[in-house]
Amino acid sequence: MRKFCLLLILSLALPVFCLLQAVEPPKKEIRAVWLTTVYGLDWPHKPATTEAGRKAQQQALLDILDRLQEANFNMVFIQARLRGDVMYRSAIEPVSKTFSGKYGELPGYDPLAFVVDECHKRGMECHAWFVTFPLGTEKSVKEQGKLSVVKKETKNFAKRHNGEWYLDPGVPETADYILSLVKEIVKWL
């Protein structure tokens, strides 16, 4: 009986070991970081309202990327859509005031292009990620004025809840709207 159990275990284990040997390792290891742009959490910490501010803002990103390169990171996920605003010139949503201090204005350079170029110079991939449903507080929507999707949209897919605005994921137009942003950034790249 003992020999039978051993033979049974080996006959079951052998195919598993063979499968483990046949699995190829991934072509590359992903060592990534998410850089958040909303609320000045990761970058930028403050808007660039002057030429010196622009240079300081760009240098702050260079410092982050240099540290990531030294730590052998090979990929950056940058938050390209914040909360109803973006970090690049868009025909759909305003540029975030996080970068220049004013909605709809670039800080004298294109922040997304700058991030992508600087990542590539360091041999790192750069991927844009979006915050999809949150649009911002009542205050930020008012600051955006006519640039806000809340003011522009006519199909009622933006909803307010507890003083915050959101795209309603239960409305088909929301998916169309998000897809339009994705298509825009893909064409931009």
Q: Whereabouts are the PLM-identified features?
A:
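Active-site-adjacent "subsite" loops/lids of carbohydrate-active enzymes
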Residues: 28, 36, 40-59, 117, ...
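Aromatic-lined carbohydrate-binding/catalytic grooves of carbohydrate-active enzymes
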Residues: 71-107
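Catalytic domains of carbohydrate-active enzymes, especially glycoside hydrolases
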Residues: 56-85, 188-189
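Surface-exposed amphipathic alpha-helices with a cationic face
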Residues: 24, 69, 113-127
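Positively charged n-region of N-terminal signal peptides that target proteins for export
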Residues: 1-4
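Bacterial Sec-dependent signal peptides at the C-terminal "C-region" and cleavage site
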Residues: 15-27
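Bacterial N-terminal signal peptides
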Residues: 7-16
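Hydrophobic faces of well-ordered beta-strands that scaffold small-molecule active sites
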Residues: 31-35, 76-78, 126-128
